[in-house]
Amino acid sequence: MEISWGRALWRNFLGQSPDWYKLALIIFLIVNPLIFLISPFVAGWLLVAEFIFTLAMALKCYPLLPGGLLAIEAVFIGMTSAEHVREEVAANLEVLLLLMFMVAGIYFMKQLLLFIFTRLLLSIRSKMLLSLSFCVAAAFLSAFLDALTVVAVVISVAVGFYGIYHRVASSRTEDTDLQDDSHIDKHYKVVLEQFRGFLRSLMMHAGVGTALGGVMTMVGEPQNLIIAKAAGWHFGDFFLRMSPVTVPVLICGLLTCLLVEKLRWFGYGETLPEKVREVLQQFDDQSRNQRTRQDKIRLIVQAIIGVWLVTALALHLAEVGLIGLSVIILATSLTGVTDEHAIGKAFTESLPFTALLTVFFSVVAVIIDQQLFSPIIQFVLQASEHAQLSLFYIFNGLLSSISDNVFVGTIYINEAKAAMESGAITLKQYELLAVAINTGTNLPSVATPNGQAAFLFLLTSALAPLIRLSYGRMVWMALPYTLVLTLVGLLCVEFTLAPVTEWFMQMGWIATL
């Protein structure tokens, strides 16, 4: 018997999402206009909370759908305007270009990356050293690349590892649905579950590594560029200015990596199953034996393109997204990928997230129009100069964990610059505040996927359901890093930032403009 029209509409609405989730979203859509009529300020914060809820439930339904519906309603009822949303999108075009082109460009370097990381994984048997190497590699790369790019690299490697073993475990040689475990017997499932735990820990170490490295340089994160430009700093200036905070944080972060692996805390410590190692070793041996000269040329070309990528980003020869586009063009041209459909596959991972980020910019527009952060900013600027550093750091951290890092960093640096230009604070204090804003925006935000775009990208990637990495599990595994990075960063802002910066000036390494 065919279902009713109403039932059919209900089933189509948000597809396979649970009924309670669908009902919750409908309630949000009904309540928001009513609250907006009473108090636009409260309605604005309610919208932010609802959007965070959709992100937290990312595995129930991709946040683009419910978040998009909330954003459309927000524009429709007047919480913001379509023109303001367009302005926010235009202001963040660099980030969108990064997602569209840089992430896709990495897709065409997966052969080289899989080769390198397979050798790394097979040559380092100690899980502690392997975790440390992933964290250090991610930190180093994210000092020159955007964190999203680095996470995209590690995701592609992890999916490659998982796919190799999954095909063996399911006794299927051709490409299969990696989420389908129905053809795997109980013995293989136990090993597969251990392998998932192993990959989860590596992904989290790498993800935190991007935060450790990304905060150190002006090209590490999009907001770093904005802050560096506002302060008039170049690459070397930015690194030295941040180092009183970022260097101790990096050291403590790496020690935390070793500690959680050693003590098997917070879901870490899972080792690579020997059976999986054997499969990966066989795959590596087979790949090397079957590698033709044409394949070797591809690897060499990809390595050269990798050098170009790091060099172009370090010297900021062009916008990040345009450099990514050059990677796509060079990699496809020189490795023989000419089919439109083959090229199109590179964009399947990044474009949904690009659309999601665009939706988020509409929420940012609401935050600005409803002046949701104004009371916080006014409170901070009324404090003493010494207290301002810690308060800027703390409030940046709190807001960055629930909002867009680029937005939070931009708002605070603009407010600090306005205060400096009006004479409320000195130029020297402004430069110290710029460091507090940058570190406060980057470090505490590892607490949730909402704060780190790289974490959110990981959570909503094709890898997350494969390795059972949910929102809650990600927050739990990030907790030791959150505590260490946040507290060490705060202590450095409080006690070492001003004296070390003063010493740098006396040595002539940096100067106030």
Curated annotation (Swiss-Prot):
MF GO annotations: sodium:proton antiporter activity
Any Pfam family hit: NhaB
Signal sequence range: none
TM regions (residue ranges): 23-43, 52-72, 97-117, 120-140, 144-164, 202-222, 238-258, 303-323, 348-368, 391-411, 447-467, 475-495
InterPro entries in the record: Na+/H+_antiporter_NhaB
Disulfide bonding pattern of the chain: none
Subcellular location: Cell inner membrane
GO CC annotation, single: plasma membrane
Protein name: Na(+)/H(+) antiporter NhaB
